[in-house]
Amino acid sequence: MPEQREKKKKDESDSVRAEGVVEEALPNTTFRVKLDTGHDILAYISGKMRIHYIRILPGDRVVLEISPYDTSRGRIVYRR
């Protein structure tokens, strides 16, 4: 019987967390977010936020996870 391989979960340390303000709501639940550092990022809503119907509006403060591979895109993981 072959050995079962353990599934590797994405390590949260791979992504960078940042905070910013939603500037604009774009189609397909995409948002333009201005980070506290001044950079603009395109961000989408995480799956848990979609499931729980958490609404995001322009002006909301949000926490993002940004991939180190593409720093111009991110995922919104929390609304403050």
From Swiss-Prot:
InterPro entries on file: NA-bd_OB-fold, RNA-binding_domain_S1_IF1, TIF_IF1
Main location: cytoplasm
GO cellular component, one term: cytosol
Alphabetically ordered keywords of this record: Cytoplasm, Initiation factor, Protein biosynthesis, RNA-binding, rRNA-binding
Sequence ranges assigned to domain S1-like in this UniProt record: 6-80
Keyword Cytoplasm: yes
Pfam families recorded: eIF-1a
Record GO terms (molecular function): ribosome binding; rRNA binding; translation initiation factor activity
Family, similarity comment: Belongs to the IF-1 family.
Entry function: One of the essential components for the initiation of protein synthesis. Stabilizes the binding of IF-2 and IF-3 on the 30S subunit to which N-formylmethionyl-tRNA(fMet) subsequently binds. Helps modulate mRNA selection, yielding the 30S pre-initiation complex (PIC). Upon addition of the 50S ribosomal subunit IF-1, IF-2 and IF-3 are released leaving the mature 70S translation initiation complex.
Protein name: Translation initiation factor IF-1
Species for this entry: Deinococcus radiodurans (strain ATCC 13939 / DSM 20539 / JCM 16871 / CCUG 27074 / LMG 4051 / NBRC 15346 / NCIMB 9279 / VKM B-1422 / R1)
